Amino acid sequence: MNVTKRTFLALATSVTLALAGCSAMEDSVASRGGDLDPGEAVDVRELGGYVLTEGSQTDRGFVVDDALQTPSGRTLHFSLHVPDSYDGSVPYALYVACPGWEGLYFQGVGANLQEGYPFVANDYIADMIVASPQLDNWGEQSASDVVELTEWLLGAYSIDADRVYLSGCSGGGETISIVLGTRPELYRRVLHTISRWDGDIETLTAAEVPVYMAIGENDDYYGSGPAREAYEEIRAAYRARRLSEERISELVVLDVKPTSYFTERGFAADAGQHGAGGYLFAHDEDIMGWLFS
């Protein structure tokens, strides 16, 4: 059987088999209509009660409209890029990029790919699978969907669990803050841009997952105040855990960009810093380099 970018590996399902009494393998074999040879790659459409309907549209290397039916009956819509070099023999990194309001599912299939974050990621880590979910909103259900999609990808592909990255822009930043208030241990590093913090800080700080917060000083949607407040609350929570100031500075970074940052990059002084930041931060090598370091 040929190995393709859309192939899930028997190796990647081995842990699931041990935990689920081989039900995932039964689904896999049934889907291909034959026996499974040890170590052979299989074109799995079902895995552990999940059913994937692969998308038919593509955009700059992404399959745009994948739909994953969960055991609970929800459908998770997402775009996925798997590098041509991926064959499952070596674990790859994973990056989950959550878009803002303009990328939610009701905005239309593929609207999430208006942002640059998914497209620049492989410039920093070549051996990385990139997913961009199309969520329903920026609240708790969408945060649960991000966690579930992350966990499914970890089981469906050969992924290095120590190299899983997360970002959220605008409303997506609100969503990932809730994710970090529930399952922060899934992620190595997190980028939170032009947004505010809605998640549980104690859960985040217990896990010590590094977070970078970037926003314009005069962000015209949120303002920079909520990000500043969250930053101070996170630092205070780490101090309460008796971490050193040096260690705290490694775990949380606040980057408030002055107006000069935007004007030096071609935006008018009175341009909206929310939209400008959403564009510029994805192409800022210092910001993106921090995430993927």
Which residue stretches match the model-derived regions?
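Short alpha-helix in the alpha/beta-hydrolase fold that links the catalytic acid
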Residues: G110, G223-A236
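Gly/Ser-rich "nucleophile elbow"/oxyanion-hole loop immediately N-terminal to the catalytic nucleophile
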Residues: S85-V90, W138-S170
